[in-house]
Amino acid sequence: MKLENFFSKAMFCAAIVAMSVTIASCTDNDDTAGDDSQPTPIDAGPTYTDKMVAVNRDGNAYGQVSLRFYSDMLSVAYISIADFHKLMTGGDVMKVTRQGDLYLLATRNGTATVDVKADYLHSTTYAGFVDLMWMTASDLAPNTMYDGSKYIKFVKLENVSTFKPTSGVRLDFGKYSIDLHDDGSNVYFPFATLADIYSDCNFHNAAYHDDLVIVSTKLDIYTINTIAPEYAAKPYQRTDVTADMAKFRYQELCFVFDNLFGYPGRTIMEQNGMAEKGFDAALDAVQNGKVVKRLLQSTNNMDFAWGRMAMHYLIYDGGHTSFGALSGVPKDIQDAYVKSVLSASDQYPEASNMYKEWVKEDEERSKLEKKLGDLRTQAYGDVLYKANTAKTTGVIIINSFMEMDEAAWNKYYASQKTDADWQELMKSYKKDVFIGFLYGLAQAKADGVKNLVLDITLNGGGSCDIVGADVALLRKNRTVQFWSQDALEGNNKIATYFVDTNFDGVFDEKDDTNPKFDCSDMKIAVLSSKVAYSCGHQFPTLMKDYGFPIMGERSGGGTCCIQVMQTADGQNFMISTYRDRSTDKNFANTDAGITPTEGYAFGYDHFYDLDFLTTKLQR
């Protein structure tokens, strides 16, 4: 794969209160009754300067917010956590109560205690404390997956057990030399630290640099860049950062990977003890890791760029964790940045070699993807559905769970839902992968096939909404469950959803008894490959748990959802997050891939041979 692709390839509400005034104080404080004096700070920190900074929220001017700059770290912006919470939520108030030398923070779904002397935050309801999913839909539980599709509905989330001993979440900022401060009634964190803590699987995130705060609440990985592209490009145009920013930038990376990473299990850093001894010590254990550390700690942004390049290899998990994300930045600036990095490669032999190792891995996957694509095209042509001559076996091709035609679904669900309305919806079968799946089911039912293969051999992932809806229809049951873990809290979770399988706009028992397509008379199997990743891996995981055979070869893994972040100076990256790490129904790690059902494994020469697949399904 060319280096240019490294920078561009992504492997992957509650009502917003309009705000045009300055956010001067958004804390509901509870101090000693009858005492009008300013409380004495516990850790005021060194001298500081407050600065009013403009806010852009989802592309709209959103007033100003006060940021604080302490004299020992003049380049690092701090913000009251209550102000930050109000920014992210569009007006929700965090209640801050001082209790001796501690602060109790309360949001609508959780609480946390902060010790500014010892620089830590502790919470027994952490997922709820930082929860923003209620902004997407009011009934969503913290850390649930939902992309807003009208045909699937969240029902409940159950924490059924734990997989590690825990007395709550403790974030020890002092371990990373991240100082917390207060003014007697408010608690101040680095802006970048709070942005990392609050970012979630629905891509709510924020950034500050160059005198502007950007907040994104849109369901898109790179919205924070597309909101203000020229602004997003500025960190990549700088040759250097200050010494205090370089130090903090590295320490914040250490904090993120020690605490917020999902630990899928496959990365070189994990194999070198990152979970046990931390990011910094794991770098020391990796060959040439100390060189990478030096680059990541440098004030020189070319050094830092090559540190990022090396880390992309060391933390490579198939694509969910990536340091090569520039999408949304103006193309001319992207091109100039890539050119400058390319021209400097000889100056970074160790990092360059690591990058080349990553290229080898990615090229192998790309070669396999092309090979399978060519084989399938030769066998079927460019189609979404194919049946054998005898019409006994059909195959539905599902290359992605990503593409959605929201307008088509909105129009359908607002209609009378007549046959004509349904046929109008079906016209979007090439633009919406779930509609494409329904189109394939309609063809299979019309052909009267008794064997159905779901071909996900080239599926790189997408939305859990579509995965869940597909599974519900195939098993003729409106209920679909997702098994997963919260890697930070240590919980084993089951998320339950209902699917509107008859597409009448109502979630009820008719979805069990009278679905749009009844597949119960078919023998159904999933055809998988190592290319199938992320939701392309989750689909065979669920199908196997629900008793359907998996054919071909093991899937490609990719169990954690994505959390989008920025480095402390504003450069994009994303990680496999702790918030949701999918498992099988026994809460076993599946990142190595879902293996075929016994007797259903076979070579690529049989993948697209419908007669061969028929014999397998008729066993």
List the predicted regions and their residue ranges:
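Bacterial N-terminal signal peptides that target proteins for export
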Residues: K2-C13
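Bacterial Sec-dependent N-terminal signal peptides
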Residues: L3, M19-A44
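N-terminal low-complexity, Pro/Thr/Ser-rich intrinsically disordered segments
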Residues: A33-S66, K234-R238
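C-terminal "post-core" interaction segments
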Residues: P229-D240, K247-Y250, C254, K391, ...
